Amino acid sequence: MNIKFRLILMNFMQFFIWGAWLLTIGAYWFQNKGWSGAQFGAIFSTMGISAIFMPALTGIIADRFINAEKLYGILHILGALTLSSLPLVKDPTTFFWVILLNMIFYMPTLSLSITVAYAALKGSNKDVVIDYPPIRIWGTIGFIAALWVVSLSHNETSVNQFYIASAVALALGIYSFTLPKCPPLLSKVSNKSFVNLLGLNAFALFKIPKFAIFFAFSLLLGAALQLTNAYGDTFIHDFKNVPAYQDLIAVKYPAIIMSISQVSETLFILAIPFFLRKFGIKYVMLFSMLAWVLRFGLFAFSNPAGGLWMIILSCIVYGMAFDFFNISGSLFVETQTTPEIRGSAQGLFMMMVNGFGALFGSFTSGVIIDKFFTMADHTKNWQGIWLCFAAYALVIAIIFPFVFRYKHNAALEHAIQHA
């Protein structure tokens, strides 16, 4: 079977698992179980908590003790078991712990999938810059497909969403053992010091200025991603409280409107190779930050009637905001680290974006919104909220090019292919 097709299948299932429940778990929580909103807030914190330590830890394990594709498969099989047990849970506290356990198994597979894909492409003499983005696009397609499968089968409030995700996780776990081997590379290194053995040498990247700065901005951009995930859908839902808007299609079906963001992801992924070759990694990252400014700024002045075009354009811009940093960031890590620590380094990248970034964004935005943008009647000043978020992204975009000193060079493609 063609290696590209095999990696496409891997990416499709990787994100199908997440898409099968991530956007519909709220409907299950409130409409099926009738549990409280305060308790539900803790559910999304499990992603940040698990992303802080698990990707880096499993990256170290993959670099030192076990083939990355085997570890990837084991984690998905364990994730399938936890997902299939969720329908048995009868109280929100236990539900939190089971979801946390599932996230502990799932979050590291995001970085491991990159490690496995890059190794397989290089082993087949493929160019990562050219060949990986069209493969990764199928992950987003998988996410969208899962959302539509669950919705069209009327399982948005049903336990079946977890069974669907579990079945695909089990299939991916088994399939992973057939992927090209990605063995630990420490065995090729003669210096097996205590630091190398535990994988702590990957953390030494923080001593290198360009990496310290890169990881800091990874955290800040991770916070921006959390802001849009947490408040985008809620923002549109709140228009139902305005009589003039409550019967509009965008208000009745906000998830359909927001799904434009995922479609945009698939299109911007295809543009990444061109932008990387034309502008280099540094400016592609900068374009991502400017896109976040537009994402939030357009929301600030939009509405579901005459301003619907702004909501749609904001969703389109999201593709650039999300893809241009996440994909170019993983390529930066890939090209600037030695083979022995790449798995650990990819884990650190995911830890900063989905771990500390998610927690930072969730906590600070909650405090700011409650303190400055929540009215006495508990309604929210959404324009103020989005302008605040846009200002945050703008400050990041202004500072970044002055402190991140990384120059694009013509040898980038060669370094990626032969590193």
Regions found by a protein language model. Give the residues of each.
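Juxtamembrane intracellular "pre-TM" segments in multi-pass secondary transporters
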Residues: 1, 179-216, 241-246
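Hydrophobic core of transmembrane alpha-helices in multi-pass small-molecule transporters
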Residues: 12, 82, 92-112, 116, ...
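Helix-loop boundary and gating motifs at the non-cytosolic
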Residues: 1-48, 211-246, 253, 326
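Multi-pass alpha-helical transporter architecture, strongest
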Residues: 6, 85-89, 169-181, 385-419
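A membrane-interface helix-boundary motif in multi-pass transporters
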Residues: 152-168, 367-393
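Cytoplasmic helix-loop-helix junction between adjacent transmembrane helices
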Residues: 100-138
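Cytoplasmic membrane-interface "Motif A"-like loop-to-helix N-cap segments
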Residues: 63-76, 277-289
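C-terminal ends and interior cores of transmembrane alpha-helices
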Residues: 77-91, 290-304
